[in-house]
Structures are given as structure tokens and as C-alpha cells.
């Protein structure tokens, strides 16, 4: 078994959709980034890549490459899953935390879990997502951005 951790943060801006965990969430602001800026999936992808010593998402999906501009992070998560499979690894467990003052994430967490599990070909029970605030402290507390962190375990695939 191997373990990886990931962290990501993006600024909230007007004129962008808010996509977290592959779910479009109604909000007056969205996350700024080269792809769809899905902070949760970025943290999970970094954790998965780290667990198998493949670097990070910046190495594989650089923000200087136009082919990733506006790209769905679910698609990129699928690519990371493919990279794991090529090394004969599969995700055993994902535990992630979204850190956002607003909007509330609770209504969307189950759909996020299903999205992630489906893309990686694992059971929903292997994916846990939590959400918390910073009690009004810092850039997240002021509503300037959203952060996410993830820890994953991966094991050798049997097939």
C-alpha cells in the first residue's frame, strides 16, 4: 500500500462557473484557473500522482498547455486513473476536505463522491468528502477562495 497527499487552492472570481467535485454549484462566483479549476479534484489528482511517485498535476497537465484550457477535471482525473493503472495501481481509499466559507457544500457531496468513484472505477464507499469553513478567518473566510486537501491510499491492482 502507498499513500499520497494533495492540496489545492483557487481564487473565487465573477464570470466563472463554480465546479467542485465535478458538480456545478450555483454561486455568484467561480474558481479561477486554467482548466475548470475544480479545487477538490486537483487535490485528489495530486494525491494520487504522489502516491505512485508520478509528480503532480502541473507536470502532467501544465497551465501553459492550451489543450488543457477549460478542460474538465473529471476528464483529467480519468487520465490520472489511467496512469495509475499503467503502473498496476488502483485507489483503495480517498479522504478529502473542501475548505470554503460559502456556498455550503453538503447538498452536493454525495454527487461528488459518485462522480469520483465512477471515474476511477471504485466503489462510492471508498470515497469520503467532508466540508468545513475557516470560521471567517483568512482568504477562505473572507470568501476570496476555496481550498481542498486530500489523502489517498493506493494498492496493487489485481487485474
UniProtKB/Swiss-Prot annotation:
Reaction(s) catalysed by this chain's protein: 4-CDP-2-C-methyl-D-erythritol 2-phosphate = 2-C-methyl-D-erythritol 2,4-cyclic diphosphate + CMP
Feature type site, description Transition state stabilizer: 34, 133
Enzyme class, UniProt record, top EC level: lyase
Cofactor(s) needed for function: a divalent metal cation
Protein origin, superkingdom: Bacteria
EC number(s) reported in the record: 4.6.1.12
Gene Ontology terms for molecular function: 2-C-methyl-D-erythritol 2,4-cyclodiphosphate synthase activity; metal ion binding
Keyword Flavoprotein: no
Keywords, sorted A to Z: Isoprene biosynthesis, Lyase, Metal-binding
Any one biological process term the GO annotation gives: terpenoid biosynthetic process
Classification via InterPro entries: MECDP_synthase, MECDP_synthase_CS, MECDP_synthase_sf
Pathway: Isoprenoid biosynthesis; isopentenyl diphosphate biosynthesis via DXP pathway; isopentenyl diphosphate from 1-deoxy-D-xylulose 5-phosphate: step 4/6
Annotated function: Involved in the biosynthesis of isopentenyl diphosphate (IPP) and dimethylallyl diphosphate (DMAPP), two major building blocks of isoprenoid compounds. Catalyzes the conversion of 4-diphosphocytidyl-2-C-methyl-D-erythritol 2-phosphate (CDP-ME2P) to 2-C-methyl-D-erythritol 2,4-cyclodiphosphate (ME-CPP) with a corresponding release of cytidine 5-monophosphate (CMP).
NCBIfam families: ispF
Similarity section: Belongs to the IspF family.
Name this polypeptide is given: 2-C-methyl-D-erythritol 2,4-cyclodiphosphate synthase
Annotated source species: Alkaliphilus metalliredigens (strain QYMF)
Species classification: Bacteria, Bacillati, Bacillota, Clostridia, Peptostreptococcales
